[in-house]
Amino acid sequence: LSKSINHSLENLQEFEIAKTVQESLLPQSSISNEVYEIEGRTHPMSKLGGDYFDFTLTPENEILLLMGDVAGHGVQAALMMAMAKSVFMLEQDEPEAHLNIMKNLNQTFYKLRKSSIKTMMTGQVVLLSNKSDSIITNAGHTSPIIINKNSIETINLASYPFGFTKNRKFKVTPFKLKENDIMVLYTDGIIESLNNSEEMLGNQDFAEILKASYSKDLNEFHNNIFRFYKKWATSQSDDLTFLLIKRKENA
């Protein structure tokens, strides 16, 4: 009994440490510059989720973003998030930061897959340019959606997760946001959610939710999305994370 109690206490301490680490990884919920306004929120399924996002202002006052989804939950997922955070922090101010982040994450997860740690992470990096086309680079993550009051468009980015090949070349895809356009980055927890009939929401119905939820106010937009999700899903079976990126009026 004493051994069992000690083991339980060790597990609890491990959990609390991982929870503290994970809570310190996510940035504040919003960031902006003279051109863009961004809000990010995560809704973990459990106290230790596997979703991660980060953003920062570059030395040129542009915005660099990372969104990732680590397979699973718990202590291991929290540690993988910490590794992603360290890569982002090390590279964020360097030239070609968007590509270096992707390459370093790929190398990290390639080495992990070759070791005894079997894990997986999808992710994407976005560099928001103030004057020219913005760019996005993807590794198996969900396709971004650009929406405004009158239209909705999906940027299809077919790719595979980090770590499956050693020296991987990442495709850089340009895009442009117009005034009051909002780009929605999200993890797969929303599109894979199930209703009472065990039907998956899917990409098409998620697009309909976005159209019904659209607001130029990012906080309201997010609240609308989550309200529709709660009506659809019987219970939360995965982490949910959203990054809403808006190009400001007259910017």
Regions found by a protein language model. Give the residues of each.
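Conserved catalytic-loop aspartate of Hanks-type protein kinases
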Residues: D188
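Divalent-cation-assisted or electrostatically stabilized phosphate/pyrophosphate-binding catalytic cores
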Residues: M200-K211
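Terminal output helix/cap of sensory domains in signal transduction proteins
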Residues: F221-Y229
